[in-house]
Design a protein with these regions (language model features):
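N-terminal glycine-/charge-rich "phosphate-binding" loop or analogous flexible N-terminal tail
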Residues: 1-38
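Phosphate/diphosphate ligand-binding glycine-rich loop within oxidoreductases
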Residues: 40-86
């Protein structure tokens, strides 16, 4: 399992490594090429999770470490079977 995590989520460091291959990246640097084979994303509002980012990817779950969710295209995720939460 591959998980990409926004590097501004310091409390997660070390928590998922026993279970997954984890990559910590600045939110603005999370690109379609990087998420292509990722199973999950843990993001903040800087990462726009829409068709441009997710099309053709293996992502099945997006967790947002934010109060709002306006950076997640819920309609697109629903059509693709991508679960998300914030």
């Amino acid at each position: 399992m591959k998980v990409i995590i926004d590097d501004k989520s310091p409390y997660l460091k070390g928590a998922l490594e026993p279970f997954a291959e984890v990559f910590y990246l600045p939110g603005a640097e999370i690109t379609p090429d990087l998420v292509r084979d990722a199973d999950a994303l843990i993001t903040r509002s800087r990462t726009i999770c829409d068709e441009r980012l997710l099309k053709g990817s293996a992502v099945k779950y997006i967790a947002s470490a934010t109060i709002g969710a306006d950076h997640i295209d819920a309609e697109y995720c629903g059509k693709r079977g991508i679960a998300w939460s914030n």
